[in-house]
Each structure stands twice: as C-alpha cells, then as structure tokens.
Amino acid sequence: METVAYIGLGLCVLGVCLISWGLWDLARIIKSLHDTK
C-alpha cells in the first residue's frame, strides 16, 4: 500500500511541475507576441 501512495504522490508532484512549466512557457510566448507587435 505504501508504494502506491509514493507513486501517487510522485505523479502529483510531476503533474504540478508540468502544469507550472506549461503555464510559464505560455506566458513567455504571449510576452514575445506582445513584444513583436
């Protein structure tokens, strides 16, 4: 049971990292689009 909890926790952390990285990338793209105009 403990291994399942650790795997679930690891996936949650990974998901949060991917979401925050994706949002950071999106913000950077939007900023570059505003700069070119």
Curated annotation (Swiss-Prot):
Taxonomy, superkingdom: Viruses
InterPro entries, per database record: DUF5516
Protein name per Swiss-Prot or TrEMBL: Protein 6.3
